[in-house]
């Protein structure tokens, strides 16, 4: 049973990013574009909030601590203003970023690019400077993570400006079922995530038609795709009431989907992402006009992916040397594809796992520890 759609309208077109630019700066921007063919993105990112220790995160969000927001690495000016206004929200921005990062690493664990993080506030390194489909996925899944975290924080009473969901009762809900359990506040989560995550892109000003403006449009589109995926996958959940579980009465509410389901959906969008370019009006259009235009839930990209086989400091590729591979697989995790034809080394390792588990009354499970020697394969 699907929920009613309240705040989203279908078919929002991709907008333009612009702003006036002096001729001198315009020429400099063009020179940068033709020299490097990639956008220079700020080293810091709000994603870095997801890399901090959760205990430390909760300790620094003290009401009235004005220096806090200016000290947080990775926030744009607009995001710092929102931080000052909604300091109790920032812990959940961090949790959302962390959720997105972990899901990215899960979805790409068997790919040459495995969503590795680096030890600085850019989080993913220089690879995000390229407008590739991997970058598209990363923006989408992190935006989705924020919607997820904020929506749940509202339901749990952690935020001062929101509470349980006030979504309208679905029209197809049986009349004798109650509507109004404390649901995840996805409306609020969506709105705040949009305001916060998009702030950096909306305050950047570049010449119409420049590569930088194309990246802004790409980022905004993929942010929205991530948010909509969370919104559209949320559904109605119900709990039975009645004597001996007879379920003669049900109470229902709006509930977020498991985030793995969101990650799976975005991974499918990654595989079918649309290649885009800027047209003469400064809007993103599909490179191949024979295909249907991407919807607001599809991912888009403007650059081909770099070579992830070898380490490259300029593109941020870490290469696949030293990565574990599956000798028997013919998929992306197989040694042939993962190692890019370079071959692999084999070694033996000892693995310990629980085994021979038995249930004892009452009430615990007791297991033994078993060890075995297994073969592992590592890319040369």
Swiss-Prot record:
Keywords: Chondrogenesis, Developmental protein, Differentiation, Disulfide bond, Extracellular matrix, Glycoprotein, Lipoprotein, Secreted, Signal, Wnt signaling pathway. The keyword Signal applies. It holds the Pfam family wnt. Disulfide bonds join 104-115, 154-162, 164-182, 238-252, 240-247, 309-340, 325-335, 339-379, 355-370, 357-367, 362-363. Glycans are attached at residues 114, 120, 312, 326. It is found in: Secreted, Extracellular space, Extracellular matrix; Secreted. Glycosylation is necessary for secretion but not for activity. Palmitoleoylation is required for efficient binding to frizzled receptors. Depalmitoleoylation leads to Wnt signaling pathway inhibition. One of its GO terms (molecular function) is receptor tyrosine kinase-like orphan receptor binding. Belongs to the Wnt family. Ligand for members of the frizzled family of seven transmembrane receptors. Can activate or inhibit canonical Wnt signaling, depending on receptor context. In the presence of FZD4, activates beta-catenin signaling. In the presence of ROR2, inhibits the canonical Wnt pathway by promoting beta-catenin degradation through a GSK3-independent pathway which involves down-regulation of beta-catenin-induced reporter gene expression. Suppression of the canonical pathway allows chondrogenesis to occur and inhibits tumor formation. Stimulates cell migration. PANTHER family: PROTEIN WNT-5A, WNT RELATED. This is Protein Wnt-5a. It comes from Mus musculus. The lineage of its organism: Eukaryota, Metazoa, Chordata, Craniata, Vertebrata.
């Amino acid at each position: 049973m699907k929920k009613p759609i309240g705040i989203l309208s279908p078919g929002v077109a991709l907008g333009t990013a612009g702003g006036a630019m002096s001729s001198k700066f315009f020429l400099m921007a063009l020179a940068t574009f033709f020299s490097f063919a990639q956008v220079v993105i700020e080293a810091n990112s709000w994603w870095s909030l997801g890399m901090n220790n959760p205990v430390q995160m909760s300790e620094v969000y003290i009401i009235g601590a004005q220096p806090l927001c200016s000290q947080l690495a990775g926030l744009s000016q607009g995001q710092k203003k929102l931080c000052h206004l909604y300091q109790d929200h920032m812990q959940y921005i961090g949790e959302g970023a962390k959720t997105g990062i972990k899901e990215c690493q899960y979805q790409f664990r068997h790919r040459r690019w495995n969503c590795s993080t680096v030890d600085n506030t850019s989080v993913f390194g220089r690879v995000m400077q390229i407008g590739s489909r991997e970058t598209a996925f990363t923006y989408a899944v992190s935006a989705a993570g924020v919607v997820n975290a904020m929506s749940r924080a509202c339901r749990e009473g952690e935020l001062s400006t929101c509470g349980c969901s006030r979504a309208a009762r679905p029209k197809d809900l049986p009349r004798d079922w109650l509507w109004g359990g404390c649901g995840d506040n996805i409306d609020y989560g969506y709105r705040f995530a949009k305001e916060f995550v998009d702030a950096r892109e909306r305050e950047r000003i570049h010449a119409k038609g420049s590569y930088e403006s194309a990246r802004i449009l790409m980022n905004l589109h993929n942010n929205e795709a991530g948010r909509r995926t969370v919104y559209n996958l949320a559904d109605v959940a119900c709990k039975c009431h009645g004597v001996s579980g007879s379920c003669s009465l049900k109470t229902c509410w709006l509930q977020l989907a498991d985030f793995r389901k969101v990650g799976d959906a975005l991974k499918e969008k990654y595989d079918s992402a649309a290649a885009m370019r800027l047209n003469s009006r400064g809007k993103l259009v599909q490179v191949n006009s024979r295909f249907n235009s991407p919807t607001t839930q599809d991912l888009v990209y403007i650059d081909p992916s770099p070579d992830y086989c070898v380490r490259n400091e300029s593109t941020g590729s870490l290469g696949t040397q030293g990565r574990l591979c599956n000798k028997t697989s013919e998929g992306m995790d197989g040694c042939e594809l993962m190692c890019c034809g370079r071959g692999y080394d084999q070694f033996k390792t000892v693995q310990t796992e629980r085994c021979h588990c038995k249930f004892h009354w009452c009430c615990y499970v007791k297991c033994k520890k078993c060890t075995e020697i297994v073969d592992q394969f590592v890319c040369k």
